[in-house]
């Protein structure tokens, strides 16, 4: 019920304030795994189809890894309605890079461990290069989060990343 209330508030906020940008809505593992919730959310998106493309539903990589098949179903159903999907705190210990093609994702927000001190760590640099290349092929936008160091920020600008947050 909490996730439903948040979604209703976000939809109203977008409509009332004529918001034009996308808004991400965090969902619980329980909601993503609940077929009744998925039916409800599909109806809510369809009722508000003019803003569907602005709704980005978010799950953690950990939640996705807990039930991959349910998440795939959820992502496919959300996309059928015109909304978007992001996996946040993405880590390969939960979802291997090779498995990204199995999901229908719009965005990946990387765990901050991948970018902290990246300018000094060749394995992190290789990872960012790999995920950037793969995401480009899969049409997924990559967002490194919470980059603190100016050197790391400058280094990340070399890659074809959608955005970097500080």
Where on the chain are the PLM-derived regions?
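Single-residue recognition of alpha-helix boundary sites
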Residues: 37, 99-100, 122
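The catalytic core of metal-dependent phosphodiesterases that act on cyclic dinucleotides
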Residues: 44-118, 134, 138-166
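Active-site-adjacent beta->alpha loops and helix N-cap segments on the catalytic face
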Residues: 68-69, 119-129
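Catalytic core of bacterial c-di-GMP phosphodiesterases, primarily the EAL and HD-GYP domains
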Residues: 2-73, 146
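Ligand-binding cleft/hinge of the Venus flytrap
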Residues: 25, 131-135
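Membrane-targeting and insertion segments and their boundary/processing signals
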Residues: 15, 102-105, 126, 130
């Amino acid at each position: 019920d909490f996730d439903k209330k948040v979604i209703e508030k976000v939809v109203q906020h977008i409509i009332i304030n004529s918001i034009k940008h996308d808004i991400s809505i965090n969902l619980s593992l329980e909601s993503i795994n609940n077929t009744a919730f998925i039916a409800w959310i599909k109806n809510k998106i369809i009722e508000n189809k003019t803003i569907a493309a602005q709704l980005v539903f978010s799950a953690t990589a950990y939640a996705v890894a807990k039930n991959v098949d349910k998440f795939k179903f959820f992502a496919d159903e959300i996309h059928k309605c015109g909304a978007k999907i992001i996996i946040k705190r993405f880590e390969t210990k939960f979802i291997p890079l090779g498995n990204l093609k199995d999901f229908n994702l719009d965005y990946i927000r990387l765990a901050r461990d991948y970018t902290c001190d990246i300018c000094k760590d060749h394995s992190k640099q290789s990872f960012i290069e790999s995920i950037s290349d793969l995401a480009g092929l899969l049409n997924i936008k990559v967002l490194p989060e919470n980059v603190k160091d100016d050197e790391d920020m400058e280094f990340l600008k070399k890659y074809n990343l959608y955005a970097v947050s500080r």
